[in-house]
Each structure stands twice: as C-alpha cells, then as structure tokens.
Swiss-Prot record:
Residues 1-23 form the signal peptide. Residues 460-831 are cytoplasmic. This is Prolactin receptor. InterPro entries: FN3_dom (IPR003961), FN3_sf (IPR036116), Growth/epo_recpt_lig-bind (IPR015152), Ig-like_fold (IPR013783), Long_hematopoietin_rcpt_CS (IPR003528), Type-I_Cytokine_Rcpt (IPR050379). The WSXWS motif appears to be necessary for proper protein folding and thereby efficient intracellular transport and cell-surface receptor binding. Residues 777-803 have a biased composition (Polar residues).
Length: 831
C-alpha cells in the first residue's frame, strides 16, 4: 500500500516536469557576471552574460549590498554602459567600500540568480587607452630619431590628482615580436637605434596606480629613411560614385623621404588638354579628393594622377581613367528592421524591411537598385545569401527557434556598378514556443493515432468475426421451398418455372403481331350479315378497310396463351372483318345473290352493360369506337366479370371483338366498292377463301337507357371446353353452370361449333369462326338456348341483339393438333 502511494506521489510530481519538458518552457538559465571596471576610481560598471531564457521573455535585475550594510539595492542605471550592464555613477560609488553584487533572471515560470561577485573599486580600475598618437622622425648629428606623442584617455579629469603610467611598444612591420618601452607618467617618448629604410608599427597604453593596464591604442606606422630623398610614388586605390551624380577618389602615399610631403590630385577630361586640380580634399577624408555635382560629368572620362612633393623632390602616381557610369557603388541600405510576424493559423516568419541609401535618387528613377541579404546564426560561420531584387522587404521562413540570427543587406545598381558595403549587423532571436506548439500538436496526434490503432486491434481480436459480418454481410440464399438451387445457379429458367408449376414464357417475337385495333369489312350483295329481327337490302357501295394495328404489347393478345399457341401454329392468313352499315339491305340481298349461308339467332331480353368509369383495363386491344363509344374490356374469369357487373350502376352495352392476327401482319388499308354483280361477289369469295377463319358477327344495338345490374349467369361462356381432333380441329365452348353441360347453338337446324374468336369490331360486334363442315351436315345436337334469369329490378333492355354466323365456301385449316383459345373476352353470354 505504501509503495503504491509513493509511486502515485512520484507520478503527480513528475506531471509538471513532463509538461514543462513537452513544452520546452522552463526556468531561466543562471546568468554570469563577466567583469566590473572603473575608469578613473570614481565610477564603475559591471557586465553579465545571460543564460538561457527558458523559452519565455526574461528580465534581468542586478542587486547589490555594501559590506557594512544589510540593505539590498538595485542597479541605478541599466543604459549608460550598454546592454546587460549596470553603471554606478559618483553618487553610488565609494572607493573604500566592497560591493556584493548578484544578477537575477526572472520569467513566468521562475527565477535564477548568478553567483555573488565581490567588488572593490580600487582593484577594478582600468582606464581607457591613450589617444592622439603621433609619430615623427628627427635627425640630430646625422642620427635619425623617432618621436612619439599622445594624450591621456578621454574620460580622465585634468583637475583630478590621478596619475597615469604609460607604456609603448613597437616592431618592424614585417615581424611579429613586439619591443616594449616603459615611458612613465610622460606623454611623449624619444626612440633611437632604428634601422633606416624600414617601416615600424607603434602602440601605447596606460594604467592608474593601483589598477590594471588599459587596452592598447590603435596602431600607427612610420618609415625610417636612411637620408634625405624625394618621396615615393603614391598609388590611386579607388574611385567611387555613391549616387551617379558625384564621385570620390582615394590614394595611398609612399615613403616621404624623411621630410614632410604634400599630395596633389590632378585630372583632365577626355578631349581636353587643360589640367585641373582636385576641388575638395576634405569632404571624403585624408588622402582623398571629392568631386561635387559641378565638377562631375556623367558622359566624360577623367584622367587622374596624384603627385607627392617634399623638399627633396616630387613623384607622381600612374594615371587612372575614370568613367562615372562604371564606378557607381551606392551606400549600404538604411533603416534595416527585423520583425517576427505571428499570423493566425500559419507558421511564424521573419519580416525584413529596409530603406534605400539616403544619397540614392531612387524615386525619380535616376538610379535603380537591386538588393541582397545574408544571415547566419550568431554562433555560425557560414552566411546564407538571398537575392531579393528591387523590393525593400522580404519574408524569411523556416528559421530554427531558440537561435539568434545576424542579418545584413547590401545593394548595387541594376546595370553597371558594384555592390555596396554590407549594412551594420542586425540581431534577432527566434523564440522557442513556435516549435514547441508544433511538437505538441504532433505528439498529441501520435498519441491519439496510437490509441485508435490499439482500440481497433483490440476490437478486431475480440470481435473480429462480428466486425467482418457487419462490414461484409453474407449473401442470403433462396428461401422458397422446392427451388432447385442448381437450376437457379445454371440459369435454366424454363426448368425452374416448370418445377414451380408456371407456364413458360410466351414467344416475344409475335406479341406485336397479335395486336390490331379493328377490321372493318363492308359487303355488298353477296357478302352480308343478317340481324336477328330485321331484313333489308345491303348497300350497293361497301368498303373493305384494314385499320392500323395497335401495338401495345400489354394488351390481352399477349396475355392469352391460347392465342399465342394458336398463332404459332397457323400459317400466314389475311385477317378480315365485316361491318354492316345497313342490316336491312343485307337481309334483302341474302336470297339469291351470295353463296354464303347466314344463320342468325335472335337473343331477347339479354344484354351486357359496361360502365366507362368503373371499367378495368382489358387484356384485349381496346378499340376506340366511333360515335365516342367507350372502349370494351375482357376478363379471364366469371369472378372478375361478376365484380364488374356488381359494382356498376350505369352501364352501356358493349361488344368485344377478338381478332386472330396473322404471324406476319402488315399494315395496310384496302378500300373497295362492290357494285353488286357476280364479279364483285367472286372477288369477295376469293378474299375470304384465303383465310382460315369464318367470322360470326354479333351486334348489339345500343340503348340510351341506363341498365341495372346484370346477373353473373349472363357470362357463362368464358373458356374452351374441348378441342375436337377427329377430322379438323374444332373448338367447343364450355358453359360454366352448375350442371356443367355443354351447350351448342343451332340456327335453322344446323349445329355450330365455334373454332375461334376472329376479332373485335366497332359498333359492339363480336366475330366468331364456325366449322365449315358443320354448315352442310345436319346435326341432332341442336338444343334451344337457355335463357338466363333476369333481375326483376332490371330496366327495359333492347332485344334486337343478334348473332350472325357466316361461313365461306372453302375454309381450310391445317390440322395442327390440339388448338384452343381463351375467349375470356366474351363479355356477353349466349343462350
């Protein structure tokens, strides 16, 4: 238990450290005091070196206390001596006091202090270097002497009683060893025993007693000549134009020959013989000549020489030819600024901005400058150079956080000229927090990805099968009992359907051929249909017209298997239908002018009514009848017919015409006028002899009165009973009463066996085809038609509905086996 408690405490304590480690933000590093120095024993300064800032802004504070006091004071001045320093003026300086000094670094997380530094002002005195060092040679008694003179440090107070001790060192210019000469408190020194004809380098330093030596002064050089001689030839070092409007030339003097020497610059212009002297020796510094705008010609070549003269003679430099266009070297860019930008949702970058050189006339376009920058880490040695072009700003990306960079910029003219000097160094430090944020994001993403992978692996191990089943569910098998899966896989649909007790698919090639709207035939004298109760003369002019076929494959012609099977067995025959325009004329003409026999059976008190609003879609082609008659419908069973008759209150009598189309049906329209002679009769007989069917036409006169409901017994002939195969195929209709007996219709003592339905015509006419052999053979099977019972509420119905049966002389059929048809479209019932 104790071990668990200890481990928990350790984890809790390590959490802040882990957080600090992940974010790379920590306490500041320990600063270090480098040195403390007093220039004249009256003031002093201390400098320190900062440690790491811990990734956060850090403040540095210097605290001190005196040996005789316990009170702690803060630095009085952080600016005078520069960055990371503290300056103590005379008010805060005591020469006989020891100071205990520490530096504290503080950031948001914490603070850190340097080691204490004990300072006694008398022991840290280090004056500045002497200034104004001059060298001069003098000859005394043919001996050459060197006189060196200087001044005390600049901060030394002349009114003070401090005494400086000086020390001088010199060496030949070609050697490395220095010769040191103590001077004392004097500010000049005379040196002899020098080698004539050699150049020497001289430096001076000083100290206070007690204290430390100052830094050496700057170097001064002098040539010790062996005797009196003219000066050496000077050398022109360079000529430069900063803005392509003025220029300056510099030279390097030679040996002066032991005498003071004067230098003069002379020049002449191309194409002129006149010689001019330098207009200004002071503006550009010593050993130089400045040409202002008045003395500068942009398209002129200058021939320049420098002449050195002393008491012993003179000497001139080599001529130097100058064209201002090619000596342009602008000044370094000014106002260089470095700024670290922190855009939202983007990485930080360093923005560098600068200004063109002050003397360059860039706005007017007289001078166009290109810029180049370089940067490196403070501790690095190699510079990274970037060409910027003519813009005065640049964005630096991909800088390493936590490092301090040095940046410099220079420029040059876009055409002729040279690069300027590099600008002064600019420093900027890139904080660590940007890289830390990126690291945190990647660490979090890595941890989350690892957790997700572990969870998915664990889930797959424990519930792999369920996951696979959920992602890839199994294909379900057939659930119908009795299906042979082998037949289903092999694709034998016919055997599969036969196993299920379903009929095979009907041939698709004949569906359209079985469809026809209606066939109108107008017969004249020899070809006529007789109504049941009226007689008359047929019209002298009749037309035989074949209308356009309805090719709706969804009609009943495609649904009836009997028609399909019969159609496949029949030969090509021309379908025909007869339409009687005048029934009375046909009856009058019947006696001696036509060879066809017509038998009409009158049916009284029996009608079929159909309502347009409640009618269903027929399985036979719906015909648009003339005089805006509604389309007729057919059904496959008495039950459906009973549904129609039991749900309609307003129905009209309609006739259904069923047509047996030819296998190769053609769309054509024939119009013929029958005059009444024997030639027309023979033509009609030949036309009908080409077909294998005899039509029976049933016409029902329409009534304007609304009829009541019909009894279901009216529709009793709805299917085929049997097919005779004795001599020629014959179809017998089946009566669907309870007695189950077969009824045959006879007219004038002749039994009629209906072979098939031919077609459905307009004007409510049903056409059937009888057997030709029965027309000439009497039969004893004639029975009167049974009348169906009428509904007592039924209204008055027209009784002039007739069924006319005609047969051509020669109606040949091919004995093609058992043929039957489904006359489910027989809407009226027969007596």
């Amino acid at each position: 238990m104790k071990q668990n408690l200890i481990s928990s405490v350790q984890i809790i304590l390590l959490l802040p450290l882990t957080t600090v480690g992940l974010t790379s933000q920590s306490f500041p590093g320990k600063p270090k005091i480098i040195r403390c120095r007093s220039l004249e024993k009256e003031t002093f300064s201390c400098w320190w070196k900062p440690g790491s800032d811990g990734g956060l802004p850090t403040n540095y504070t210097l605290f001190y206390s005196k040996d005789s006091e316990e009170k702690i004071y803060e630095c009085p001045d952080y600016r005078t001596s520069g960055p990371n320093s503290c300056y103590f003026n005379r008010n805060y300086t005591n020469s006989w006091t020891t100071y205990n000094i520490t530096v504290t670094a503080t950031n948001e997380i914490g603070s850190n202090s340097s080691d204490p530094q004990y300072v006694d002002v008398t022991s840290i005195v280090q004056p500045g270097s002497p200034v104004n060092l001059t060298l001069e040679t003098q000859r005394y008694a043919n001996i050459m002497y060197l006189w060196a003179k200087w001044s005390p440090p600049l901060l030394a107070d002349a009114s003070s009683n401090h005494l400086y001790h000086y020390e001088l060192r010199l060496k030949p210019e070609e050697k490395e060893e220095w010769e040191t000469v103590p001077v004392g408190v004097q500010t000049q020194c005379k040196i002899n025993r020098l080698n004539a004809g050699m150049r020497y380098v001289v430096q001076v330093r000083c100290m206070l007693d007690p204290g430390e030596w100052s830094e050496w002064s700057s170097e001064r050089r002098i040539l010790i000549s062996g005797g009196l001689s003219p000066p050496e030839k000077p050398t022109i070092t360079k000529c430069r134009s900063p803005e392509k409007e003025t220029f300056t030339c510099w030279w390097k003097p030679g040996l002066d020959g032991g005498h003071p020497t004067n230098y003069t610059l002379l020049y002449s212009k191309e194409g002129e013989e006149q010689v001019y002297e330098c207009p200004d020796y002071r503006t550009a510094g010593p050993n130089s000549c400045y040409f202002d705008k008045k003395h500068t010609s942009f398209w002129t070549v200058y021939n320049i020489t420098v002449k050195a003269t002393n008491e012993m003679g003179s000497n001139s430099s080599d001529p130097h030819y100058v064209d201002v266009t090619y000596i342009v070297q602008p000044d370094p860019p000014a106002n260089v600024t470095l700024e670290l930008k922190k855009p939202i949702n983007r990485k930080p970058y360093l923005m560098l901005t600068w200004s063109p050189p002050p003397l360059a006339d860039v706005r007017s376009g007289w001078l166009t400058l290109d810029y180049e920058l370089r940067l490196k880490p403070e501790e690095g040695e190699e510079w990274e150079t970037v060409f910027v072009g003519q813009q005065t700003q640049y964005k630096m990306f991909s800088l390493n956080p936590g490092k301090k960079y040095i940046v410099q910029i220079h420029c040059k003219p876009d055409h002729h000229g040279s690069w300027s000097e590099w600008s002064s160094e600019n420093y900027i430090e890139i904080p660590n927090d940007f890289r830390v944020k990126d690291m945190i994001v990647w660490i979090v993403l890595g941890v989350l990805s690892s957790l997700i992978c572990l969870i998915m692996s664990w889930t797959m191990v424990l519930k792999g099968y369920r996951m696979i089943t959920f992602i890839l569910p199994p294909v379900p098998g057939p659930k119908i009992k009795g299906i042979d899966t082998h037949l289903l896989e092999t694709g034998k649909s016919e055997e599969l359907l036969s196993a299920l007790g379903c009929h095979g698919f009907p041939p698709t090639s004949d569906c359209e051929e079985l469809l026809i709207e209606y066939l109108e035939v107008e017969d004249s004298e020899d070809h006529q249909l007789m109504p049941s109760h009226d007689s008359g003369r047929p019209s002298k002019n009749a037309k035989i017209t074949l209308k356009e076929t309805d090719r709706d494959s969804g009609r009943g012609s495609c649904d009836s298997p009997s028609l399909l099977s019969e159609k496949c067995r029949e030969t090509c025959a021309l379908p025909s239908a007869l339409q009687i325009q005048d029934v009375r004329d046909v009856q009058a003409k019947k006696a001696g002018k036509r060879s066809w026999e017509s038998y009409c059976v009158a049916s009284e008190r029996k009608a079929l009514l159909f309502n347009n609003e409640s009618a269903k879609s027929s399985t036979w082609p719906a015909v648009q009848l003339p005089n805006n008659q509604p389309p007729t419908f057919a059904y496959h069973s008495i039950v459906e017919a009973n549904k129609i008759t039991s749900t309609t209150t307003n129905m009209n009598v309609a006739a259904v015409l069923v047509e047996n189309e030819e296998r190769h049906q053609s769309l054509y329209s024939i119009s013929e006028t029958i005059s009444g002679g024997m030639e027309k009769q023979e033509e009609m007989e030949n036309l009908h002899s080409k077909t294998t069917q005899t039509t029976v036409q049933v016409r029902q006169n329409r009534s304007n009165e609304k009829l009541p409901f019909l009894n279901a017994a009216l529709m009793d002939y709805v299917e085929v009973h049997k097919v005779r195969q004795d001599e020629e195929p014959t179809v017998l209709l089946k009566h669907k009463e309870k007695s189950g007996k077969i009824e045959k219709y006879t007219i004038s003592g002749a039994s009629k066996e209906y072979t098939k339905v031919s077609t459905v015509m307009n004007h409510n006419i049903l056409v059937l085809m009888p057997d030709s052999r029965v027309l000439h053979t009497p039969t004893s099977q004639e029975e009167p038609a049974k009348e169906t019972s009428q509904n007592p509420q039924q209204g008055q119905v027209e009784t002039n509905m007739s069924y006319c049966m005609t047969a051509p002389r020669d109606c040949q059929r091919e004995p093609s086996g058992s043929e039957y048809m489904d006359p489910s479209s027989f809407m009226p019932s027969f007596k």
